[in-house]
């Protein structure tokens, strides 16, 4: 077995282990952040500052009975959370998380694969995760799950169109779909960040990413007040945990991608080294998603569709036209 294959396998194992751990810890952070905004304590009983709440939740999920409803399609019911997990982790393959570094005289590239269409690969594979809520809802033999899967189809497909059109303008400026090249394009300094050249694209992509991630205020797929837990209504134990681990893994992936595409990625930020800089940026966008969840109310399905097709889509197309004109001039 070649050294390249061994290195790639090690990277995959590290990526899955790290982001699985981060996904579990993110539940604790989010509960603490929401508690702060709502003037309460959040997790505080299990361990110091409630830090062992993550371990307690993990033990609970692993030991709960795995229930499959009567009349459900067992194979598809089991396959759905696996699709969610695979989609979330495979989409991370082209993301350069840190600058290259040397270990024992061997140069390490902290990404799985530097493919020329890295950004498109990230969006396409991430969008394949739409099959998870669709299949979960169809296989559960539950009306609330079915409504949740129908909402998933409409919401995720609609905003996938917007996010794909939104990234065209920044890609026209850079001239490459590779996330490594996009990061390198912004290596000249603070003023080279694409957020200053494409502010509208940044805002549209950020909003579309929240809709694709099923984050508040766009969490119509599992809106408790209307459809119980949506497509997850009949899930319990480890399968339920897999859905939400995939959601947090996607959140971290989008946070890194937004940091790379619009905020200079892992290029050094003044006196701050590049590796620390990208962690600060990605951490901020994870926190921002939690802040938005604590601040904004849910939107109605009709409001969501109106915003997508009547506001965001025309703005994305306008941004493409204006960017093309500026480049030609």
Swiss-Prot record:
- EC supergroup of this enzyme: translocase
Q: Which GO terms describe its biological process?
A: aerobic respiration
Query: Keywords on this record?
Result: Cell inner membrane, Cell membrane, Membrane, NAD, Quinone, Translocase, Transmembrane, Transmembrane helix, Ubiquinone
Instruction: Please tell me whether the keyword NAD is annotated for this protein.
Output: yes
Annotated compartments: Cell inner membrane
Q: What is its EC number?
A: 7.1.1.-
Give the transmembrane ranges: 9-29, 42-62, 75-95, 117-137, 154-174, 188-208, 238-258, 269-291, 309-329
Q: Name one GO cellular component term.
A: plasma membrane
| InterPro entries according to UniProt | NADH_UbQ_OxRdtase_su1/FPO, NADH_UbQ_OxRdtase_su1_CS
Q: Name one GO molecular function term.
A: quinone binding
Record's catalysed reaction(s): a quinone + NADH + 5 H(+)(in) = a quinol + NAD(+) + 4 H(+)(out)
Q: Report the membrane topology from the UniProt record.
A: Multi-pass membrane protein
* Entry superkingdom: Bacteria
Protein family (similarity comment):
Belongs to the complex I subunit 1 family.
Query: What does the function comment of this entry state?
Result: NDH-1 shuttles electrons from NADH, via FMN and iron-sulfur (Fe-S) centers, to quinones in the respiratory chain. The immediate electron acceptor for the enzyme in this species is believed to be ubiquinone. Couples the redox reaction to proton translocation (for every two electrons transferred, four hydrogen ions are translocated across the cytoplasmic membrane), and thus conserves the redox energy in a proton gradient. This subunit may bind ubiquinone.
State how it assembles. Answer: NDH-1 is composed of 14 different subunits. Subunits NuoA, H, J, K, L, M, N constitute the membrane sector of the complex.
Which named protein is this? NADH-quinone oxidoreductase subunit H
> What organism is this sequence from?
Helicobacter pylori (strain HPAG1)
């Amino acid at each position: 077995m070649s050294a390249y294959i061994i290195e790639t396998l090690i990277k995959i194992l590290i990526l899955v282990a790290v982001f699985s751990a981060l996904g579990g810890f993110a539940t604790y952070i989010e509960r603490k952040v929401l508690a702060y905004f709502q003037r309460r304590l959040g997790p505080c009983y299990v361990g110091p500052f409630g830090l062992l709440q993550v371990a307690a939740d993990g033990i609970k999920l692993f030991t709960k009975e795995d229930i499959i409803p009567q009349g459900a399609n067992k194979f598809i019911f089991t396959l759905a959370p696996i699709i969610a997990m695979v989609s979330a982790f495979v989409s991370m393959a082209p993301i350069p998380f840190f600058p290259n570094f040397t270990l024992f005289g061997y140069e390490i590239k902290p990404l799985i694969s530097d493919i020329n269409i890295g950004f498109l690969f990230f969006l396409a594979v991430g969008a394949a995760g739409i099959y998870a809520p669709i299949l979960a809802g169809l296989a559960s033999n539950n009306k609330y799950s079915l409504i949740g899967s129908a909402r998933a189809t409409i919401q995720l497909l609609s905003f996938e169109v917007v996010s794909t059109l939104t990234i065209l303008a920044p890609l026209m400026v850079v001239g490459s779909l590779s996330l490594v090249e996009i990061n390198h394009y912004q290596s000249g300094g603070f003023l080279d960040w694409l957020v200053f050249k494409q502010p509208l694209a940044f805002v549209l992509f950020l909003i579309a990413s929240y809709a694709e991630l099923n984050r508040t205020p766009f969490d119509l797929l599992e809106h408790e007040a209307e459809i119980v837990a949506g497509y997850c209504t009949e899930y319990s134990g480890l399968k339920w945990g897999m859905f939400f681990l995939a959601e947090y893994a996607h959140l971290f992936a989008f946070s890194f991608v937004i940091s790379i595409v619009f905020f200079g990625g892992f290029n050094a930020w003044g006196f701050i080294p590049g590796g620390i800089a990208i962690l600060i940026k990605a951490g901020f966008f994870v926190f921002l998603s939690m802040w938005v969840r604590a601040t904004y109310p849910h939107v109605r399905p009709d409001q969501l569709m109106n915003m997508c097709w009547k506001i965001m889509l025309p703005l994305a197309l306008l941004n493409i036209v204006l960017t093309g004109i500026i480049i030609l001039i």
